[in-house]
Each structure stands twice: as C-alpha cells, then as structure tokens.
UniProtKB/Swiss-Prot annotation:
Chain residue ranges for the region called Disordered: 247-267
A Pfam entry, by short name: Rhomboid
Taxonomy of the source species: Eukaryota, Fungi, Dikarya, Ascomycota, Pezizomycotina
Organism: Gibberella zeae (strain ATCC MYA-4620 / CBS 123657 / FGSC 9075 / NRRL 31084 / PH-1) (Wheat head blight fungus)
Name of the protein described by the UniProt record: Rhomboid-type serine protease 2
EC number: 3.4.21.105
C-alpha cells in the first residue's frame, strides 16, 4: 500500500510540474540554477545580486530585479520555491505569460524594492541587504487575499472575525518571529504593492494590453513557445495544456477557475 501511495504522489507531482506555464518554469529554473552557481567560491554571486541600499545606483540598478532570484543557501531557495511556485502558476494562468514577465520584472518588483531602499536609507539609516523570492510570495499572497476578501470578508477564530485581507500581514509577522534573519520590511513592501494590484490598480502599472497582444501576434509566441499562456487566458502554446478546471465566462468563453474572483489585473 505504501509503495503504491508513493508512486501515486510521485505521478501527481510529475503531472503538476509538466503543466507549469512558461514564465513560472523559467523562474523556477533560474532560481535553481543561481542557487547552484552560488555554491562556487570564485565569484560572490549573492554580493553581486543582493538588494543592498547603499549599493543602488544607475550602474547597479539591476539589483532591483535580480535579488528575488538569488538566495542565501539551498534550503532558503527550496522553501521559497515551494511557496512561490503555486502562487506564480495561478497568476500566470490567469493573466498570461507576457503580462507576468512585464509585471514581475517591472513594477511588482522594482516598486517595492525602491520603497525598501528609501525606507532603509532615509528613515532607518541602515544598510541591510535582502535576497530571495519571499517578497514575490507575499506580493502574490496579498493580491489573492484582496480577491478572497471581496467574496469572503472574514474568517473566524473562536469568536473573533478577522478580515481575510490581513492574512499576509499575519503570516509576515509569524515568519519574522519564527525565522531569524528574515526582512519584515521587505515583506511589508511586497504586501503593499500586492494590495495595490489586488484592488485592480495594476492596470496602471502594466504595459497596455494592445501592445502585449501586438508582440504576442507579431512573434507568433503561441506557436513557437511551449507552455506559453496567451493574454486572453484561453490558449496555451505548443505542447502546453489547457487548465484542468474551466467554467464558462460571462461571454461564453472558458475562464480559468482560481481562488476568489477572476478579475483581470491588466488593463
């Protein structure tokens, strides 16, 4: 019975991994590759890519985008991957590969990173560097908590009604208390931009949809890229698969079933 259960779990895990959309796959592979590359001692990859407030300048602005991909050690990377992968997969499935790329290597990363640097330097007068994808995790959690709040405003513990939108805030405090060395400020900056995006203001941050559609059609991305998710959320690229659970949308088209609402974050 036990070997059969193990085989079943292995098959489910393999099936899940083979269905991951393109951007999520690339993020997972990049984190794994950079974690392996960080093991060598010839070049300090962590020092190069960390978000260090006093190191941010025009020539080092790449740090605003590289820090989520680099981790302190293998365990740090594994824990963040376990938390990030399902959240990123749901986001990309709903909003498309190009939109995910534009947002996560754009405003959803750079805005909280700049906020962290400014608060560290101007308010705390400190220079604590941060690494890891946990800021992305809390950004995505905050976005989902807002969507959940719209349909289920409270959850109950004992006789206390707790707003569902506070879930990522509670989790960030628990993580800060239980795991030494974590950046509460970094997580709070990620949560803040997640709340903004969750309320629908990401359309002010994302590139215009007509531009993304033009790129998608011009480069014929649906045909040439495996597991690419179209902006219209109904079509995957070659070798990709459709979402396992669909329901009719308002116009009769299929829409991916996600936790909470299916409201777009794009324009």
């Amino acid at each position: 019975m036990r070997p059969r259960l193990q085989n079943f779990n292995a098959l489910r895990a393999r099936s899940y991994l083979t269905r991951l959309p393109l951007f999520t796959r690339l993020i997972v592979l990049a984190i794994i590759a950079l974690s392996i590359a960080s093991l060598q001692s010839v070049w300090n990859l962590r020092e190069w890519g960390a978000l260090i407030p006093e190191e941010i300048s025009i020539t080092n602005a790449y740090r605003l985008s590289t820090f989520p991909l680099i981790h302190l050690n293998v365990i740090h990377a594994i824990l963040n991957l376990l938390a990030l992968t399902p959240l990123m997969e749901r986001f990309e499935t709903e909003h498309g590969t190009l939109t995910s790329l534009a947002l996560f290597f754009g405003p959803l990363t750079s805005i909280p990173a700049v906020a962290y640097v400014l608060i560290e330097r101007c308010i705390f007068r400190a220079n604590h560097g941060v690494l890891g994808a946990s800021m992305w995790v809390f950004t995505l959690l905050a976005m989902e908590s807002i969507q959940t709040y719209k349909s289920n405003p409270h959850f109950v513990i004992g006789s206390v009604n707790i707003p569902t939108w506070t879930t990522p805030l509670i989790m960030s405090l628990v993580v800060a208390a239980l795991i030494p060395g974590t950046s509460l400020l970094g997580h709070l900056c990620g949560i803040a931009i997640g709340y903004v995006a969750g309320f629908g203001y990401a359309k002010l941050l994302a590139p215009p949809e007509w531009g993304l559609r033009w790129v998608e059609n011009r480069l014929n991305l649906l045909k040439i890229l495996p597991h690419y998710v179209s902006i219209d959320k109904t079509t995957y690229g070659r070798f990709g698969v459709l979402p396992t659970t669909n329901r009719p949308g308002p116009s009769g088209s299929a829409a991916t079933e996600l936790v909470g609402t299916t409201q777009r974050l794009g324009p």
